[in-house]
Amino acid sequence: LPYITTSNLYWDRFELGNLREMYFSENEIEKCTATKGDLLVCEGGDIGRAAIWMFDEDIRIQNHIHKLRSYTEVCTEFFYYLFYLYKHAGWIGGKGIGIQGLSANALHALLFPLPPLSEQKRIVSKIKESEPLMEKYADVEKYLDKLNTEFPDQLRKSILQEAVQGKLVP
């Protein structure tokens, strides 16, 4: 049966072009099967990276991927965004006192806020509403970083050009 590994799991998406296959016993099938709506989280590789399985077809997962299935009072997308926050804040997979790996025990030890379901959905809606602005900000930040990196070299070249042309002497 085909299965996904951490190399197929990215933030909010899956790369399914290179699925591996292996035999799963009847005992392993339930534990290793993700269904639509499950939040899948990397234990290794890019620790904490997560995506929601949104396909109608079930898929098997390797043992380095955690499967989180929500209950009725939990919005899976809310927990996806919490994992994104925890990862980028360095609380999982970070340096120092952050969790270095994400074993099942480490995952169970994480504390998550759990507002009422309606509030979880409202938070998710606000995040989705602001995502285009965040993406635009990220693009501008990359451009600014590029300018800041290139500026000293461009300034040096410009000064040399002015000096060669004799424009620096009054």
Region locations from a protein language model:
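Amphipathic alpha-helical segments
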Residues: 75, 79, 106-142
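Short, charged beta-turn/beta-strand-edge "cap" motif at the junction between a beta-strand
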Residues: 45-49
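A short glycine-rich beta-alpha junction/loop motif
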Residues: 43, 59-66, 96-117
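Generic structural signal for buried aliphatic residues
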Residues: 39-41
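Short peripheral tails and domain-boundary helices/loops at the edges of structured domains
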Residues: 59-81
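Sequence-specific dsDNA recognition surfaces
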Residues: 1-2, 7-36
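Short amphipathic coiled-coil heptad-repeat segments
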Residues: 131-170
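Short, conserved secondary-structure segments in the cores of folded domains
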Residues: 30, 55-57
